[in-house]
Design a protein with these regions (language model features):
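Short, well-ordered alpha-helical microsegments
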Residues: 15, 113-117, 198
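Lumenal/extracellular "mature" regions of secretory-pathway glycan-modifying transferases
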Residues: 150-169
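PAPS-dependent sulfotransferase catalytic core
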Residues: 1-88, 312-315, 319-325, 329
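PAPS-dependent sulfotransferases, especially Golgi type II membrane carbohydrate sulfotransferases
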Residues: 207, 211-345
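A structural motif corresponding to the C-terminal end of an alpha-helix
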Residues: 95-103, 176-187
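Conserved phosphate-donor/acceptor-positioning beta-strand/loop module used by diverse small-molecule
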Residues: 108-112, 126-148
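Glycine-rich phosphate-binding loop used to anchor ATP phosphates in small-molecule kinases
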Residues: 84-118
Length: 345
């Protein structure tokens, strides 16, 4: 049976390193891939079609790669149309048809967990088996990595806001991913483990997923691909402007998730994460309530700004219309067909 291996996790959690490792083990990453850039010069190992599929869909709904809203996935799935689902079905069917019966297709996409039920349904209907690998990285490291990659040109105030929002979104992403993947074979791989001893991390994960990683005893291309220097962010909260209540929740979430590394079906970890998810949802609801006046003011400011822009455009259109009328008046009556050709009536 062909397998579809979804590699996911919070953005900047090592998903590219995991997918690149799997590709070097001989598993198939659909082509073409998202091209390298200055944020990830070693490669994303992410199918371009899938990245564009999710980006086009979720960006239009305001659902971020990591989003702090507990209901963000519900927003996305409520917008799912038969046409959009049909596009994914067609792409996956073509990919699987080109692979051998025992091949593994690796789909790395850090937004897939928002619409995981769609992937479950489409993969099952294609006659394949869905398995998942979730990368784990300490929230402080994720936030520092995102700061370096995306926020270097932002003001201090905006950076502080994004730090808080990204810690919240990290926790929320883990809650959603863990809950969504409970029904399929799954593995959780800490990013430091992958870099420190990739053979041990890969052997454990592949065993949990029912995959054969091949002979790892000899020198391997992964040895040159993964280096400790890839993990450049510290796992300390020092220097980050994150409230204590969120730091405490994130640390407890991180601790509970570590249990899933050795046993992805650990019932105690599931129960703990369910409780933390509810705690987070309550905290999110409180934050929304506290910020309601600020949110309303920002919406009003945006509305006024749009109205001002529209007024400027309308004024310009009025000027252009007046100019057209002036030119038409200066040109006189339009000549009829007979006058234009000089023919007698």
């Amino acid at each position: 049976v062909r397998k579809v291996l979804l590699v996911t996790g919070s953005g900047r959690s090592g998903t590219s390193s995991a997918a690149g490792t799997l590709k070097r083990l001989g598993f198939h990453v659909p082509q073409p891939e998202v091209p390298t850039d200055e944020k990830n010069p070693r490669g994303y190992y992410e199918p371009l079609w899938v990245a564009q599929f999710h980006k086009e869909w979720l960006d239009g709904l305001g659902v971020r790669t990591i989003d702090g809203r507990p209901y963000a996935g519900e927003v996305a799935l409520a917008d799912l149309t038969p046409e959009r689902e049909g596009r994914l079905r067609g792409w996956l069917a073509a990919e699987l048809a080109a692979r051998a019966a025992d091949d593994v297709v690796v789909v790395k996409e850090t937004r897939a967990y928002w619409v995981y039920p769609l992937w479950q349904r489409v993969v099952a209907d294609a006659g394949a088996a869905l398995v998942s690998l979730t990368m784990l990285r300490h929230p402080a490291q994720v936030v520092r990595s995102r700061d370096a990659a995306y926020l270097s040109d932002w003001s201090d105030d905006l950076r502080r806001q994004r730090e808080v929002a990204n810690v919240a979104a990290w926790a929320n992403a883990l809650f959603v991913t863990e809950r969504a993947t409970r029904d399929n074979p799954r593995a959780f791989v800490p990013y430091p483990d992958l870099l420190a001893d990739w053979r041990a991390a890969v052997t454990r994960a592949c065993g949990q997923l029912g995959l054969d990683p091949g002979d790892l005893a000899a020198q391997h291309p992964v040895d040159d691909f993964l280096t400790a220097s890839l993990n450049r962010s510290a796992d300390t909260w020092e220097g980050l402007h994150v409230p204590d209540v969120l730091v405490d929740l994130a640390e407890r979430t991180w601790s509970a998730a570590q249990t899933l590394v050795l046993d992805p079906a650990d019932s105690g970890a599931r129960t703990a994460l369910d409780g933390l998810a509810q705690e987070y949802a309550d905290l999110h609801g409180t934050a929304v309530a506290v910020a309601s006046d600020e949110t309303a003011a920002q919406v009003l400011a945006q509305k006024r700004a749009l109205q001002e822009r529209l007024a400027v455009k309308n004024e310009r259109l009025d000027r252009l219309r007046r100019r057209v009328r002036e030119l038409e008046a200066a040109a006189g009556p339009a000549a009829g067909p007979a006058e234009a050709t000089g023919e007698a009536r």
